[in-house]
Structures are given as C-alpha cells and as structure tokens.
C-alpha cells in the first residue's frame, strides 16, 4: 500500500502541471534506445482471402458485427514497400508488426503456406535493407479459426503445443533478422475482452458481464490467461534452447497497463488500487518474474484460478526477457464498500471489487504522469525489468460517418495537434522515468498509419499517416504528428508551447 500512496504523490505532483514544456531531444535518451511505430497483421495487411490465408478469430468476430472489417484494411500486403519508404522518411529506428498465424500456417498446424512465408521474408528484408529494425509480435488475438472450432483455442491445453510449433517456424525462418520478439499481445486484455466482456475475439462471455451466445466469465479468463503464460514459457524455452545462441534475440510479453491512482488518499482506495494492479498487471507479471499468481487473486478467486505445478512455476518464472507495456491513459480507482456477491457466476470485475470510475484522461489529455506512474510501479514492484513501450498514442476521428462510401474528414491533418501534444508529453514522460532509474529501452507510437481498429472500426485513427479508405489505392498522407515525430527523430529539440505549435504548423502548412 505504501507504494501506491507514493505513486499517488507522483500523480499529485504532475496531474495539474499542464502540458509538458521541457526541452529535450533524441540525444537525451540512452544509447541504443529505440524509437518506432507499429501495426498488427489483421489491421494493416488486408488480403484476407489471398494467397492461401484462411480465417482467424478476427475475421469471424468482425464479420459478425456492423463495424467494418480487415478484409482490405490498409492493403499493407501489397503496399509494404511503399510503407517502408514512409518509415525511412519518418526516420524510424524500428517497425513493430505481427505475423498472421493463419497466413503462415493456415490450418494452425501442418504445412507452411509458402506464399505467406515469402511475404514476411520480403517484408523483413525490405525493413532490414533500409536500416529499420523489425520487432515481431507472434500473436495479436488471431489464431486460425480452425483451432477454435476444433478444440476451443486457448481454453484447451493443446493450444500450447500448436503455438510453440508455430513460433518455432517463425524463429527458424525469420530469426536471423529479428532480435525482439513479443509472444503475446496484451494478454490481459485478450483474456478479459475475449472471455469476460465478449468485446474482442473470440467474443465469449456470460452474465452478469454480458449475454454472449457462449462463454463463462467466472472461469474462462483465468483458464486462458494460464494457458497463455504456459505457452509463452514454452516458446521462450524453445527459443533459448534452439536459437538464442545463434540469433541473439530476446523474448518479451506485453500487457495493457493503465496509470492507476487512488481516487482519494484514503487507505481503502489505496488498497483497492493495489488490488486492481494485482488483477490487471500482477496476474501475468508475478508468474513471469516470481513464479506464481498474486496472493490477492488466489484468495479471492480460489479454486477457479488455475494452479501452477512446481515444474510449470519454474518454467514460467524468468521466461520473459523484457516487458512490453501498452499504455494510453490513466484511471482512478475507488474501493467498493458494498462488495458484490461472489456466488453464482461472478465475472472478472466482481472479483476485483473496485470501481475504476471515470478514466482521468480518457479523452487523452496530456498527462505524462500516467506513463511515469506505470514505469515507476513496474520498477518498484517487479525488480525494474527491461521495458519497451509497445503502444502509446492518442486517436483522432477520421471519418464523418461509417459506411460505403465513407467520407473522410478534410480537416483531419489540422486536427492532429492534440496528438502531437500528447506524443511530446508522453515521450518526455518516458525520459523522466529513465532519469529516475527505469530500464525503459524503447517507445513505439501506435500506430504507424490509421488502421482498422477493433473497437472503433474506421471511425477513429491512431496513425502518424492517414489512409483514405474510400480510395481503392489506399493513399497514405502524413499528419502533422508524422512531421513532428520525424523532426524529433532527426535530432531537433522537442519543445511545445503555443508558439511552438504555431511554428510547427507554419513549417508544414504547404504540405496540407
């Protein structure tokens, strides 16, 4: 609890400080610090039914909902060379992307799809030849639908073997050029969103959470989370035994982490905040770094929380070379005085017994303290492991309506100013955390270009580049944030006050 109160003090120091006005430049970051941007396969590639690719969980869920889909998306499958040129223009060190399991091994196991294999080899070679480091995510909510149909996907222990075999193919075929691997993207959100809330693939849940067609919110998130941890450990072990000596890469695991702070300075809210941290972060980081689940979860969830055998605990502990942090905003946490009933089928939030209240910067205000809170918490609670910020950004609305044809907002680029302010503030916040001892080694903007967003379709965009999704050629155009990021990565000092924003707009006014 003392740590939470200390983090609350950080919040008080920075929450009302306004925009980050410190002057800093790229040279202030440690040698080897990586700046990049990211995408994911289903959101960027398109070509959903081309060259042997078969449906994944994403395809199934998105086609069942009226919010668009990734059938074409950004058409990165055909336009990757043009996109790499844009990365060079933006001065990126690295590009984070995911491999589509259903493109590489369409049936989940068995023969490798040679056309899919060649696509990823071509993409990686294009990146490397232009001096851009590939950072690969193996799993972004998208195992082949065939495995879900056959045995229930991550609800079944069989998934561990199939995922390890798939990862082995990736290491064997791409590992000579890939040094940073993330096994699972946002494991906590995949487990909660897909098996408690039903909002993300595979869309499973039960009352009292929601009323999906199938699922059990009281137990499935924990089964899935457990199997994800065992699969990660299996993949990490495979890499270290077969490939690490030759390839020299690192294996990480990513989580969505909010900047949690107590709503008040009361002990009850501080305790609730620690409980929320245990459920959201400790659920995965404690096994990865210490070998077992938080005591808070074991006491509350009881027999519904799977148990690691002694051998499994040893395998999971220390299997993570770095922690991938996906962070967007903060949330205040309030203790629930009248505890909900845990009888029947309680969902994830009933177990946690907290109220997140209103996210303090849900509208993505410039509050870099939220990032600092996250990094300080990881440093203090988990032994300061190496960290990469794998996603962090602010969205802009890019379409006036969803539909066909869609009408793009003509003022989108000019409306990117709040996003520039956000990036400036958060990148500066990372620097403050590094100076305070955090072992943070990289920052990836989400996303390199506007993508198909699972919860927002094509209505919102996180990209440095806008994409005209009503254009068959999917024309890309830089936003003001792309120019700012490029200037920063070229070594220009970052300073944003009202005059600095005017100068930035004036500098690139002819480009819009």
UniProtKB/Swiss-Prot annotation:
Residues listed as glycosylation sites in the UniProt record: 211, 216, 436, 468
Key word Signal present: yes
Keywords of this entry: Disulfide bond, Glycoprotein, Glycosidase, Hydrolase, Signal
First and last residue of the signal peptide: 1-17
Binding site for a beta-D-glucoside: 43, 140, 185-186, 328, 391, 446, 462
Entry's Gene Ontology BP terms: carbohydrate metabolic process
Tree of life domain: Eukaryota
Any GO MF annotation of the entry: beta-glucosidase activity
Active site: 186 (proton donor), 391 (nucleophile)
Catalytic activity: Hydrolysis of terminal, non-reducing beta-D-glucosyl residues with release of beta-D-glucose
Cysteines paired by S-S bonds: 205-212
Cited InterPro entries: Glyco_hydro_1, Glyco_hydro_1_N_CS, Glycoside_hydrolase_SF
One Pfam family recorded for the sequence: Glyco_hydro_1
Transmembrane region(s): none
EC number: 3.2.1.21
Family under the similarity heading: Belongs to the glycosyl hydrolase 1 family.
PANTHER family, sorted: BETA-GLUCOSIDASE 1-RELATED, GLYCOSYL HYDROLASE
Protein name, as recorded: Beta-glucosidase 4
Organism encoding this protein: Arabidopsis thaliana
Gene designation per UniProt: BGLU4
């Amino acid at each position: 609890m003392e740590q939470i109160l200390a983090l609350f003090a950080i919040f008080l120091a920075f929450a009302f400080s306004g925009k980050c006005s410190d002057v800093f430049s790229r040279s202030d970051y440690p040698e080897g610090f990586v700046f990049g941007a990211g995408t994911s396969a289903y959101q960027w590639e398109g070509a959903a039914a081309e060259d042997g690719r078969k449906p994944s969980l994403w395809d199934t869920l998105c086609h069942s909902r009226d919010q668009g889909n990734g059938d074409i998306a950004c058409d990165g499958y055909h336009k990757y060379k043009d996109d790499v040129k844009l990365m060079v223009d933006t001065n990126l060190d690295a590009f984070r992307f995911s491999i589509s399991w259903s493109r590489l091994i369409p049936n989940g196991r068995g023969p490798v799809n040679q056309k899919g294999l060649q696509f990823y080899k071509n993409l990686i070679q294009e990146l490397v030849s232009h001096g851009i480091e590939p950072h690969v995510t193996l799993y972004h909510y998208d195992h082949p639908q065939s495995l879900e149909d056959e045995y229930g996907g991550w609800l079944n222990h069989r998934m561990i073997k199939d995922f390890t075999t798939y990862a082995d193919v990736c290491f064997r075929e791409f590992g000579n050029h890939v040094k940073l691997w993330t096994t699972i993207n946002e494991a906590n959100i995949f487990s909660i969103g897909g098996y408690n809330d039903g909002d993300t693939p595979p869309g499973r849940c039960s009352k009292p959470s929601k009323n999906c067609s199938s699922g059990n919110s009281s137990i499935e998130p924990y089964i899935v989370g457990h199997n994800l941890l065992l699969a990660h450990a299996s993949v990490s072990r495979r890499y270290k035994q077969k490939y690490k000596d030759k390839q020299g890469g690192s294996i990480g695991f990513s989580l969505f982490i909010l900047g949690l702070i107590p709503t008040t300075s009361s002990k009850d809210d501080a305790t609730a905040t620690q409980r929320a941290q245990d459920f959201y972060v400790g659920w995965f980081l404690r096994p990865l770094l210490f070998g077992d689940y938080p005591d808070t979860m074991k006491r509350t969830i009881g027999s519904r929380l799977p148990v690691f055998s002694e051998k499994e605990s040893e395998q999971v502990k220390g299997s993570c070379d770095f922690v991938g942090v996906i962070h967007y905003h903060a949330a205040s946490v309030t203790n629930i005085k009248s505890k909900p009933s845990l009888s029947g089928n309680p969902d994830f939030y009933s177990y946690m017994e907290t109220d997140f209240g209103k996210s303090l910067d849900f509208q993505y205000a410039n509050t870099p303290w939220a990032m600092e809170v996250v990094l300080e918490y990881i440093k203090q609670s988990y032994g300061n492991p190496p960290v990469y910020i794998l996603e962090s950004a602010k969205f802009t609305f890019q379409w006036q309506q969803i539909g066909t044809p869609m009408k793009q907002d003509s003022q989108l680029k000019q409306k990117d100013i709040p996003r520039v302010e956000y990036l400036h503030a958060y990148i500066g916040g990372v620097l403050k955390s590094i100076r305070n001892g955090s072992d943070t080694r990289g920052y990836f903007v989400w996303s390199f270009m506007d993508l198909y967003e699972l919860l927002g379709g094509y209505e919102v965009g996180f990209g440095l580049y806008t994409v005209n999704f009503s254009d068959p050629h999917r024309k890309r155009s830089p936003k003001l944030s792309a120019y700012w990021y490029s200037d920063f990565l070229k070594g220009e000092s970052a300073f944003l006050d009202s005059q600095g924003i005017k100068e930035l707009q004036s500098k690139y006014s002819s480009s819009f």
